[in-house]
Every structure is written in structure tokens, then in C-alpha cells.
A protein has these predicted regions:
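Central "turn" residue of the DNA-binding helix-turn-helix
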Residues: 48-49, 60, 96-98
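Short, Lys/Arg-enriched, Trp-marked, Pro/Gly-tolerant hinge/linker segments that flank
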Residues: 6-25, 43, 61-68, 72
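Short alpha-helical "recognition helix" segments of helix-turn-helix
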Residues: 43-45, 91-92
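Basic, amphipathic alpha-helical hairpins
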Residues: 11, 27-39, 79-87
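DNA major-groove recognition helix of helix-turn-helix
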Residues: 59, 66, 70, 106-107, ...
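Short, basic, alpha-helical segments at the C-terminal edge of helix-turn-helix-like DNA-binding modules
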Residues: 70-80, 117-123
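Sequence-specific DNA-binding recognition helix
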Residues: 84-121
Length: 123
């Protein structure tokens, strides 16, 4: 079985009593690449060694679009950086946003709270 096929298998597998579904495997495989400048559906499919169409079908089966997947991955990384103490402006740049306000709006749209509420403040 190819690596991509293993990542995208439809059934859930048990691993030490914890269930992982296909979307968890996709997230894990793509997370290191999501901040690449040209990270698109084609690149994601290449990373996990499947066709673009196969990746689209698998995501659809899981009830998620590629854009939602990418946004969720970026949000996860942004949350981690904010919780580690990075400034909102630094995280905005790290995530590839052209402005702090653009990042703040996108973050609030996805989470319901502004990134400044997540950021760790120095004592």
C-alpha cells in the first residue's frame, strides 16, 4: 500500500486504543507544508502521493473542503504561536497575511475571538 493510500484509507483504524480517522492522517501529513508560498490542492496531493481529484474526493467524504482544511491547519499553527508568546503582528507575518488587520479579521471569523485574547502577555 502506498503512503498516500495508507493516509487516505476510508476506514478508521485502532492504534493503542485511540481511533484516528482519515482526516487526522491528512492533517498530520500536510501540517509541515501548509505555510509554503505555493501550498495549494495540487501541492497537498503531491505531498501525500495521490491525485488532486482523489484528495478532493476524500476530503468531500469527510465533509471538508481543501480551503477549510488549509484554514484549519493555519489556525492551529497560529494558535500555538500565540500561546507560546509570539506577538499578533509576528504571527500574522508568519502565517503569510499581508496585514495584522487581515489576520485579526480572519482569526476572529474562524474562532469568534480576536487573536489578542489568545496571545500570552508577559508578566
Amino acid at each position: 500500500m502506498a503512503k498516500g493510500e495508507m493516509i487516505l484509507r476510508e476506514e478508521e483504524e485502532e492504534n493503542n486504543g485511540i481511533y484516528y480517522n482519515a482526516i487526522s492522517h491528512i492533517y498530520s501529513a500536510l501540517r509541515p507544508y501548509v505555510l509554503e508560498i505555493k501550498f495549494d490542492l495540487q501541492r497537498a496531493a503531491q505531498v501525500i502521493n495521490v491525485s488532486k481529484r482523489t484528495l478532493q474526493r476524500r476530503l468531500k467524504e469527510q465533509g471538508i473542503t481543501f480551503r477549510q482544511l488549509r484554514d484549519n491547519l493555519i489556525l492551529d499553527i497560529a494558535m500555538e504561536q500565540l500561546q507560546r508568546g509570539e506577538t499578533v503582528s509576528r504571527v500574522a507575518v508568519n502565517m503569510g497575511f499581508s496585514s495584522i488587520s487581515q489576520f485579526s479579521r480572519a482569526f476572529k471569523r474562524m474562532t469568534g475571538i480576536p487573536p489578542s485574547r489568545i496571545a500570552v502577555r508577559p508578566l
